[in-house]
Amino acid sequence: IKIQMREVFGLKFFRIVVARITNNSVKIFGEIKGWTYPNKNGLQLDTLRILSDSPEYVSELIWATTMAWALEQTNCENARLLAIYDEDGYSKKLVRYFRLIGFRVTKEVGSSPSDLLLRLIWGGAGTLMKGDCRKIMSKLERKFKNLNLSYPA
């Protein structure tokens, strides 16, 4: 797991990567990118990518790392993301996936004038969702405990 972060004018831009390093080769399994601003609702998640040939639980590991980092290194308590609308209906699957993680729908961002700022921030229209970082972290902790893995940390 690698966390990259840079701060500009009070905004923290981050990238969290899960990868395997072997013999000078790096195989990336997944990553999440986003930014924070100094507010309890300041964790903004922009890009999530999980490769299809990734080992099990890479997604959960990325989410747990993101929530732990936000809770420990920022004053953020809640995260927001936008499931972007697309032509093939993939956004419905994303909304279902994000709900399973612990997010809830807060607004459908469309083409109305009141949505203009959100469209500029997020880069498109879609389903805006919000999640409580502590609740998501607790849910992931329970899932990891139920795996009954015997690997030392």
Q: Where do the PLM segments sit?
A:
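Non-catalytic substrate-recognition and accessory regions of acyl/acetyltransferase enzymes
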Residues: 1-57, 61-153
